[in-house]
Amino acid sequence: MADTATTASAASAAASAPNASTDAPPFQLGKPRFQQTSFYGRFRHFLDIIDPRTLFVTEKRLREAVQLLEDYKHGTLRPGVTNEQLWSAQKIKQAILHPDTNEKIFMPFRMSGYIPFGTPIVVGLLLPNQTLASTVFWQWLNQSHNACVNYANRNATKPSPASKFIQGYLGAVISAVSIAVGLNVLVQKANKFTPATRLLVQRFVPFPAVASANICNVVLMRYGELEEGIDVLDADGNLVGSSKIAARHALLETALTRVVLPMPILVLPPIVMSMLEKTALLQARPRLLLPVHSLVCLAAFGLALPLAISLFPQMSEIETSQLEPEIARATSSRTVVYNKGL
């Protein structure tokens, strides 16, 4: 009760501060700044999460942000602190520190580092005239990066065997490499394709390979949820029970997100580049092809990531009538919520 009272008094102090920002909403510790019920609100929320500027936050600035949030929590906030400063401090902390362990996440594996560190891999995946070795290398590197990001941002409240992550990683690598190599071989053997058509088709091979690997990774790493169910909560955040049906919904939403995510990243650049390569500028200056290709991939990646992860709210809602009878009987709420996962 003491913590609740001090937090409430801190919230009141922040809201009534004379220099409080009129644009920023009242600060809520641990809550998203933007409403999660609308796609636009989720989009704005995830733009904050993937903001690459947080990669350049100094150790001193991080300590100041953490201390400011601690002061807010304990009701010892200094006068004049604005809601904007509190939201900024929370953004910095959430971008750098793991929420369960409070340890710093290695920079390339932070969500804010996903685009800057992942774009070179996307460029490699979409390079024309891939050899067998380069196809295997880029697919392996992409799945390795994804696995590290997933592990670094995992739910660490409960111990999870390393074998689960290894199983998901190996499954994703094997499926991605197998499909990419298989499709490349089929395209090479397709006699009906002209050399230009064959090159164009080969550029789209990474998408089905990556999309199928993403689904494989989700299923292998989270199949236990289908057997045991996931927690569902009422409107007040109280645990209602564990539901296998909610687990199926969560996995389906996550799988759809991971199929949609690589679509613009791996489909748009080949289309755009096939048109740009015909321009007089790039035909006269072929050395510009790689830099232009990289910029196109960066733009596609930067647009696709927040759009894809904004499709579904992190805490999804479902009617109790769609769940197991014991769940419906355990609560008077018409709907419950569940965490769909990363």
From Swiss-Prot:
Region (Disordered): 1-30
Protein name: Sideroflexin-5
Alphabetized UniProt keyword annotations: Amino-acid transport, Membrane, Mitochondrion, Mitochondrion inner membrane, Transmembrane, Transmembrane helix, Transport
Catalytic activity, reaction form: citrate(in) = citrate(out)
Membrane topology term: Multi-pass membrane protein
GO MF annotation list: citrate transmembrane transporter activity; monoatomic ion transmembrane transporter activity
Organism of derivation: Mus musculus
Name of one Pfam family that matches: SFXNs
InterPro entries associated with the record: Mtc
Family per record: Belongs to the sideroflexin family.
Induction: In brown adipose tissue, expression is induced by cold.
Any one GO BP annotation for this protein: amino acid transport
Gene: Sfxn5
Ranges of Low complexity composition bias in the record: 1-26
GO CC aspect terms: mitochondrial inner membrane; mitochondrion
Record's function text: Mitochondrial amino-acid transporter. Transports citrate. Does not act as a serine transporter: not able to mediate transport of serine into mitochondria. In brown adipose tissue, plays a role in the regulation of UCP1-dependent thermogenesis probably by supporting mitochondrial glycerol-3-phosphate utilization.
Disruption phenotype: Knockdown in brown adipose tissue attenuates whole-body thermogenic responses upon exposure to cold. Brown adipocytes show decreased glycerol-3-phosphate levels in mitochondria.
Tissue: Expressed in liver and brain. Expressed in brown adipose tissue.
